[in-house]
A protein has these predicted regions:
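Residue-level marker of beta-strand positions
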Residues: 73, 92-93, 106, 136, ...
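Glycine-rich phosphate-binding loop and adjacent beta-alpha segment
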Residues: 253-289
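Residue-level recognition of short, solvent-exposed, well-ordered loop/turn junctions
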Residues: 36, 89, 175, 265-266
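NAD(P)H dinucleotide-binding glycine-rich loop of Rossmann-like/cofactor-binding domains
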Residues: 103-183
């Protein structure tokens, strides 16, 4: 399978959002690549701002490099398909994710985001060349997923982050009636909370920002207001001194990592470090326990 894309000789252009340095974004224009045999041309409809993109905007992830043409949580409409594409057609609503070759060791293990064959940096110098923040883009069909045409594009754009959450839930081995604490009620924290609830778990959300507390409560979750009580002690109180079966740390902070460990029950407690943080959060574990 050939993933190389040549610049179009037809002269068609694409416009896209690009981070050029900390706190500076531009709308740029480049040649729209040719649609290869395994590619699709997408008319983009929506793209979420991931922590990866926002962190780069804040200057917290500058190791990723500039200029950054990110945007991997996106959705759009198929406008053209390559001759080898059989599972998509013009007019399909699709969500985008990472692309994989399907045959390297990482892909065979299901880690297509770490594919050894496909690199998202482009030949014309753009880092993280997902181009989700564009009017049109060409994607390999391996990273495009058909969704219902009547699905709101804004909802379809959540397919990739939801997939990461479900992957984490599987790693945690969540079971019905378990108590799960989610530290952080941001977008990803609440998706984690909703997923744990769908597994049949009792979900407790810990948060300190008033607006996020209100949102979590409006969604029906038990909420610990960290401004009013110690979250570790409150979890112990709510679980009759036992602690949580699982903790999902959806905040990239050393203090959150420490709290998560202290919230866990002694036997078979599991913790998922879901959020990245910069500077890199520390995790200190007592190896004698």
């Amino acid at each position: 399978m050939n993933f190389e894309r040549k610049c179009s000789v037809m002269g068609r252009k694409m416009k896209f959002g690009c981070l050029v340095k900390k706190g500076v974004a531009e709308v740029r224009e480049r040649d729209l690549p040719e649609v290869g045999p395994y590619d699709v041309l997408l008319h983009m409809k929506v793209c979420n701002i991931c922590t990866t993109d926002y962190g780069q905007w804040l200057g917290l992830r500058e190791h990723q490099g500039y200029p950054m043409a990110g945007g991997h949580e996106a959705a759009g409409i198929v406008e053209q398909v390559g001759e080898k594409v059989t599972d998509l057609k013009v007019g399909d609503m699709v969500a985008t994710g990472y692309e994989g070759c399907g045959h390297c060791p990482a892909c065979r293990e299901g880690h297509i985001d770490q594919c050894e064959e496909i690199r998202n940096d482009t030949e014309d110098g753009y880092k993280w060349g997902f181009f989700g923040f564009s009017n049109y883009c060409v994607k390999n069909s391996s990273g495009v997923y058909k969704v219902a045409n009547d699905l709101n594009p804004s909802e379809a754009g959540f397919m990739e982050p939801l997939a990461t959450v479900i992957h984490g839930a599987k790693k945690l081995r969540l079971k019905p009636f378990e108590t799960v604490v989610v530290i952080g009620a941001g977008t990803m924290g609440l998706i984690n909370a909703q997923t744990a609830k769908a597994y049949g778990c009792r979900v407790i959300v810990s948060e300190m920002i008033p607006k996020k507390i209100e949102t979590a409560k409006a969604m029906g979750f038990e909420v610990i207001d960290c401004n009013e009580s110690d979250p570790v002690e409150k979890v112990k109180e709510l679980t009759e001194g036992i602690g949580a079966d699982a903790v999902i740390v959806a905040v990239g902070a050393t203090s959150a990592n420490s709290q998560g460990l202290e919230m866990l029950k002694q036997n078979d407690g599991r913790m998922l470090l879901f959020a990245a943080g910069y500077p890199v959060p520390e995790l200190k574990v007592d190896s004698n326990l």
